[in-house]
């Protein structure tokens, strides 16, 4: 997908369709059970201005995020009253504050030394934001960035793709296994289906979807 799609989406809408209004219930329910320690460095790829990041921060974690849109990160810092410094780090812009490191720019420009303290990944909206043609590259780059032993907590959705065009895109359990089974032991924490899982996607024509949390 072209960068302009995401830049325009953030500029045109105060509440983009993928932006959730509350913390993800799978995160609330399963984060501790997934094996997360009390204080970790957590990487949130394609983070936008997700409220999940604030919850992770308030839970004692240092949050490292990246999003293509500098607008999204500026809005997030303003909304959460984060007094961040802003500087260039190679091809990326970085916002820094106690407990926060937020990069603005292309995910594929990140380098391993920028994530060398990460022990856990929280992916709620990164993999499903990408079309199938980009997901293998995303997974490969993510694995190359992470220190050995890093755990991945991911939330994916599966739906009838004749009813709606992504993003967010449908990612099957089989595809997720194919992308991440090498080097990771994947455990399904919860998988639920039904119209009650739709949230704001009901307005786009979906009648049901399955949401799965894995670690």
Locate the predicted segments by residue:
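Class I SAM-dependent methyltransferase "Motif I" SAM/SAH-binding loop
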Residues: 43-50, 126
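Gly/Ala-rich phosphate-binding loop of Rossmann-like dinucleotide-binding domains
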Residues: 57-58
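Class I (Rossmann-like) S-adenosyl-L-methionine-dependent methyltransferase catalytic domain
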Residues: 1-39, 49-52, 65-100, 104-114, ...
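Conserved acetyl-CoA-binding loop of GNAT-fold acetyltransferases
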Residues: 61
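A short SAM/SAH-binding and catalytic strip from SAM-dependent methyltransferases
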Residues: 107-111, 118-134
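Generic beta-sheet signal
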Residues: 40-42, 119
